[in-house]
Amino acid sequence: DLGATNARLAIVNDFKDLIYKSSYKISNFKTLEDLINHYLNEFNASRENLSGILGVAAPIIGNEINFVNIDFSFSVKEIEKSFFPGGLRLFNDVQLQGYALNSYPNDKLKSVGVSKGFPKGPKILIIPGTGLGLSILNNGKSLATEAGHLNIPNTSDEIQNLLENFKKENKRTATFEDLLSGKGISYIYGFLSQESNHNHSNEDILNNVRNDAFCDETKKILINIFAIFAKYTALITGSTGGVYLAGSLSESLLKDDDFSEFRNIFEESKKMNKYLSNIPVFLIKDNNLGFMGALEVYKNEII
């Protein structure tokens, strides 16, 4: 599971169990070859007849894979030749994590707002982090998207001022990923406080450890943008089976006291309120979705 910040690796044992689970900062490695070699050597893992499933924070286009938010790339053919004589399957990272929804336990899901049960239908998984990923799960198959690169609509005076400032500084229109992400937290706080060179961490801003009114306002704007993104993509994809939110940023941003606000913004629509009000929204607090998704692929498509 190769994100833009962290790389998580594991080996499947006896067709069902994950062993040798480990996590690394991907920036500590110059190449994917270095990373995989380091992992296999660390656990003295057998290299014989290995097959692989990789989820990558990049669009899957041809043989050359280029990550979007970091300077990292690799050749699919070279990686398969060097490490995986048994074959290599490649997925977008959030697409791979989307497969985990096929078997994720209902009792581990946290309902955002009043519970709507577990209706059938397409599902979407949204994971903000270094970037902003979204996958669609339909009839057991997970589909990758680049929905995070949609432009943010102007929905309020506050959002308008933020978007105008972004466009002035960057010479382009802001996308959802620009603001609903790690870099977006810092940018929004800097805009509100007029301190673009502040040294507050994203965690400090979201938890408001300094009792700072700009931190509260930053969080409010982020929840607004998050709920709007969830609403628009739910309408586009027809995800009547639910909207699933995951990743450390989702966990840090959405606390129990924020659920009703998120839900109200999500359902707000003069024409589609009834449709949206029947779509459940869940928060997943689990950093193993990539492994779980890979195991689903392994069990259902490879064995």
Report the location of each language-model feature:
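Short coil/turn connectors at secondary-structure junctions
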Residues: P85-G86, P119-K123, S239-T240, N278-I279
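Active-site nucleophile and cofactor-binding loops and adjacent substrate-binding regions
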Residues: N69-I70, R89-L96, K116, L125-P128, ...
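A glycine- and small-aliphatic-rich helix-loop capping segment at beta-alpha/alpha-beta transitions
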Residues: D14-D17, I70-S73, Y104-V112, N139-A144, ...
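Short beta-strand-loop/turn "lid" adjacent to the catalytic site in phosphate-handling enzymes
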Residues: A45-L90, Y99-K108, L125, E251-K255
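Generic detection of short hydrophobic beta-strand segments and adjacent strand-loop junctions
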Residues: S22-Y24, S111-V112, L150
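ATP-binding/phosphotransfer module of carbohydrate and carboxylate kinases, centering on a glycine-rich
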Residues: D1-N44, E48, I60, I136, ...
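ATP-dependent carbohydrate kinase catalytic cores
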Residues: L88-F118, N208-D216, K220
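Glycine-rich phosphate-binding loop of actin/hexokinase-like ATP-binding domains
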Residues: V114-T175, E261-E267, K271-L276
